[in-house]
Design a protein with these regions (language model features):
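ABC ATP-binding cassette signature C-motif
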Residues: 1-266
Length: 266
């Protein structure tokens, strides 16, 4: 993010000339009062908010996954069908593999047979590379870890907390480079919270998490991005508790605190 600012139509400025980058392995907790600009910043990173000043530059080939506070799910699908969307590429490969195998039962000449065998080999290699043969086990482990409802349960029957868990499960299976979570601990129980912590701690990319749960942030955050009022944003390297200690030491210090700039996904 290069010089990013955002002013709403009522002239309220929530972001003011922010320079910010992320890097693999970082777990960044975003804190601040409601209305301070946290969700706006996240939507800009996700590419959902286009009306802002400045520039957002991404490394080639990056992927971003975003969990909103109220996830949008297809109510016509089952829990498993929604979770499968997180492995869409593998699902498509397996479907084509079955279709190719079925074609071997059809009459064909030698040239057609050779092409079919070649395609079958390509699909087998691609599925092997993605460990796609274990799709059912992968989905089951992911759903169990986040205590998702029964796989056959229609999404339209889920509670708000259940929808959030299903959406989070789908998102983690996508394995994006940058993972954006807006209040992921809302409406989840202690066991699901533990699973979320484990998933984030094992996540290889950069995770950016908005949360009012200070205890949760202290367990997962390697950095804190704090909206401290008057459009002032502080980027701190360390846990939430360490940030709080640093903030207490800064009380009475009039030196301006600027967001540190780091190279993103080089």
């Amino acid at each position: 993010m290069v010089g990013v600012s955002k002013t709403f139509t009522n002239q309220k400025k929530v972001l003011n000339n922010i320079y910010l980058s992320f890097f693999y392995g970082a777990k960044i907790g975003i804190i601040g009062l409601n209305g301070s600009g946290k969700s706006t910043l996240m939507k800009i990173i996700a590419g959902l908010e286009k009306n802002f000043q400045g520039e957002v530059v991404f490394s080639p080939g990056y992927t971003v996954g975003y969990l909103e506070q109220e996830p949008q799910l297809d109510d016509t699908k089952t829990v498993r069908e929604v979770v499968e969307e997180g492995c869409a590429e593998v699902v498509a490969l397996l479907k084509e593999y079955e279709e190719v195998n079925a074609k071997f039962m059809e009459p064909m000449d030698d040239d057609q047979m050779a092409k079919l065998i070649e395609r079958q080999g390509e699909l087998t290699e691609a599925i092997d590379h993605k460990n796609g043969w274990e799709l059912d086990a992968t989905l089951e482990r992911a759903m169990d870890a986040l205590r998702c409802p029964d796989p056959d349960e229609p999404v339209k029957h889920l509670s708000g907390g259940e929808r959030r868990r299903v959406a989070l499960c789908r998102l983690l299976l996508q394995e994006p480079d940058v993972l954006l979570l807006d209040e992921p601990t809302n409406d989840i129980d202690v066991n699901t919270l533990r699973a979320l912590e484990e998933g984030l701690n094992n996540f290889a990319g950069c995770a950016v998490v908005i949360s009012h749960d200070r205890w949760f942030l202290d367990r997962i955050a390697t950095h804190i991005l704090a909206f401290e009022g008057d459009s002032q944003v502080v980027f701190f390297e360390g846990s939430y508790s360490e940030y709080e200690e640093n903030k207490r030491k800064r009380l009475g210090d009039d030196t301006p605190h600027r967001v540190k700039y780091r190279k993103l996904l080089a």
